[in-house]
Amino acid sequence: MKTTPFTDVHIALGAKMHEFAGYNMPIEYGGIIDEHMNVVNNVGVFDVSHMGEFWVKGPNALRFLQKVSSNDASKLAVGQVQYCCFPNNDGGIVDDFLLYRYEEEKYMMVPNAANIAKDWAWCRQQNTMGAILENASDNIAQLAVQGPKATEVMQRLTDIDLNEITYYTFKVGSFAGCPDVIISATGYTGAGGFELYFYPQYAQKIWDALFEAGKPEGIKPAGLGARDTLRLEMGFCLYGNDICDTTSPIEAGLGWITKFTDDKMDMPSRKIMEEQKAGGLKRKLVAFELKDKGIPRQHYEIANAEGQIIGEVTSGTMSPCLKKGIGMGYVATEFSKVGTELGIMVRGRQLKAEIVKPPFRK
């Protein structure tokens, strides 16, 4: 199993470790609900060093991005971030990723850990225009400092005014005495905060500085278990669950990151997605809350009010904030309106549920 620069720290803290995307990662330290609520109310730190990082450079960088990304990279100014996906050739999704415009002709993609090899092969295959690609996944460490108190904790460790870093923008500078740190107002929790990218040799120094600075705010480490419940309460898609090779961005409600500008004519599956956007969808991803007691899980069947099977759960959990079962899943389009009554099949029983508008945690 691969390790991150923080693996020994997690083990020393008594974290419950488990293999995730080929890495030995902390699932929880003292309890998922406790870590979840600490991020919502205070501040928590996630090791996300397993995520990938690809540099895209040179005069053909933008041309390459306008082909492989679903979004319109020409709209990005230096210092801005964009949520995107790679459409495949069959109307599905290779992966979703964040795109950073680092310099005029230098961008950074941040794909999912489980898909680094697949995404890298896809990018190289699509790079017919000679953009300079570099896979820096093993040379960059990453921490997500998330929660309403993240700014006050982190401000003690940098001269950069963190209030100037608005949502989906970033700055590069000194943090905890370490140079060239990317401080990005992004995250997968919906609780506010930042993601930090830095060279692995600074990992211990940055970790120690954060936990020292955050003592008054009750800073705690958080594992991948809480990361999943937090993202699900926001209705954020997880690759491999809610989106995959066979789901289209339009079905998944990601039409807002799918652009059809004139400089994106050679984007894979453009025609398929344009047709879907014009109204040709058989199924849609919806968010639902259980009205009965129970926990929906991936692959559970979804029925309509009459008991006919109309879809399948892609993600589900017991929401720590709402204290009820919540989930997402694909249903036939005619049953996808907010307020529609559903039945979730749990061990032969049909539990009542209702389609809601995400996020679950308001």
UniProtKB/Swiss-Prot annotation:
What does the record give as the reaction this protein catalyses?
A: N(6)-[(R)-S(8)-aminomethyldihydrolipoyl]-L-lysyl-[protein] + (6S)-5,6,7,8-tetrahydrofolate = N(6)-[(R)-dihydrolipoyl]-L-lysyl-[protein] + (6R)-5,10-methylene-5,6,7,8-tetrahydrofolate + NH4(+)
Nucleotide-binding found in the keyword field: no
NCBIfam families from the UniProt entry: gcvT, PRK00389.1
The alphabetical list of record keywords is: Aminotransferase, Transferase
Q: What does this protein do?
A: The glycine cleavage system catalyzes the degradation of glycine.
Q: What is this protein called?
A: Aminomethyltransferase
Q: What does the subunit comment say?
A: The glycine cleavage system is composed of four proteins: P, T, L and H.
Which is one GO molecular function term here? Answer: aminomethyltransferase activity
* GO terms under cellular component: cytosol; glycine cleavage complex
Superkingdom assignment: Bacteria
State the EC number(s): 2.1.2.10
